[in-house]
Amino acid sequence: LLAVMGPSGSGKSTLLSIAGGLERPTRGSVYVNGIDLAALDSVRRAEVRRRSIGYVFQDYNLIPSLSALENVEMPLQLDGVSPSKVREAAMAALAEVGVAELANRFPERLSGGQRQRVAIARGLVGNRSVILADEPTGALDSHAGEQIMLVLRNHIDAGAAGILVTHEARMAAW
């Protein structure tokens, strides 16, 4: 787990966008599982990104017309995973971050911290080999933030690589 800290506007989120294949670098390479994302066309880059990278967006990026469960299911559906396995994995991810009971709620009916947990569950679902987390504890209280950092650490310890962007030194120490 690599933690990145810096002042606002210093390029931390841009780094994650490039590392995650959301943006192409102006020069250089970005390798994920031995594949240079920068060398791929946008369709192939999106395919590799979907299968390999779990991204936790700073602004949650939840789809308002989908329930919490449906938001978490989406990456696996796009990967062609069977519907029964999609539902099981999404519910497990929601439980892992402590919001399984909110599965049928829509984002507008969730608090900021609950939205953040749903976004984290979506980033973790499917056992991605790379986890990119942009301020994953920003909307959480101290206790909830510690719980989420433990969840992220468990995924890293299980073999995922991760980049954490944070303003909090105590979170970077994880």
Where are these regions (language model features)?
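ABC family nucleotide-binding domain
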Residues: 1-174
